[in-house]
Amino acid sequence: MTAGTRPEVLHLYRQIFRIARKWQAASGLMEETIKEREYIVDEARKLFHRNKQITDVAMIKECTEECKARIEIGLHYRNPYPRPIHLPPLGLALPHSKVFRAQEKLRKQAKPVYLKSYDEIS
């Protein structure tokens, strides 16, 4: 993390914890609220810890944009979990063929900004 990006990253980190503290589940049930609050805190810790070694300013900007998008989507839909998306299937292409590489490229392009930190599960 560089000196220029540090305040923004720390602001986002604190903002997530403030949101988690005030979070109410859409169902109104206390056990779901507690579970969702724990998920928000655990997810933030996991992703910030995973990305703490990043020093490239462009990559840090991507991560902060992803964080902002996740916050906005979570608050708008009142759902702390990432929204499911449809990714193009890989089909029956051989793993080292041009078709497979083209399909991989399409899958990466189709992935929205708020899911860049998630690994591919197909």
Swiss-Prot record:
Matches recorded under CDD domains: Complex1_LYR_LYRM1
InterPro entries (UniProt xref): Complex1_LYR_dom, Complex1_LYR_LYRM1, LYRM1
Superkingdom, taxonomy of origin: Eukaryota
Assigned GO CC terms: mitochondrion
Record-stated family: Belongs to the complex I LYR family.
Protein name: LYR motif-containing protein 1
The organism of origin for this protein: Xenopus laevis
Name of the gene: lyrm1
